[in-house]
Amino acid sequence: MHPDLSPHLHTEECNVLINLLKECHKNHSILKFFGHCNDLDREMRKCLKNEYMEKRNKSRELGNAMRKRLFNPPEESEN
C-alpha cells in the first residue's frame, strides 16, 4: 500500500514517477497483474522512501533544536 499520492505532497521527481506508474496501469490493465509495471513501482517506492527519510531527518533536526532551546535557555545577564 502506498502513502497518499497527491501531487502537492511530493517532489517533482516523485510526481513524474507516480504519473508514469499510473499511466502504465492505465495502458496495461491486464499485464500489470503479471508484473509489467513493477520496475516503475520500485522506482516510485524508492523515491517516496527517500522523501520520507529527508522529511524525517529534517523533523528530527528541528525537534532537537527546539528541545535544546527549551531545556537550555540562554543565560540572562544580570546588571
UniProtKB/Swiss-Prot annotation:
Keywords, A to Z, come to: Disulfide bond, Mitochondrion
Sequence motif Cx9C motif 1, location on chain: 14-24
Segments of this protein annotated with the region Disordered: 58-79
Pfam families (alphabetical): Cmc1 (PF08583)
Q: List the disulfide bonds.
A: C14-C47, C24-C37
Q: Which InterPro entries match?
A: Cyt_c_biogenesis_Cmc1-like
User: tRNA processing: present as a keyword of the record?
Assistant: no
Record localization = Mitochondrion
Motif Cx9C motif 2: where in chain = 37-47
- Specify the CHCH domain's residue ranges: 11-55
Q: Where does the record locate the signal sequence feature?
A: none
One Gene Ontology cellular component annotation held by this UniProt entry = mitochondrion
Family of this protein: Belongs to the CMC family.
Role, per record:
May be involved in cytochrome c oxidase biogenesis.
This protein is called what? COX assembly mitochondrial protein 2 homolog
Q: Which organism is it from?
A: Bos taurus
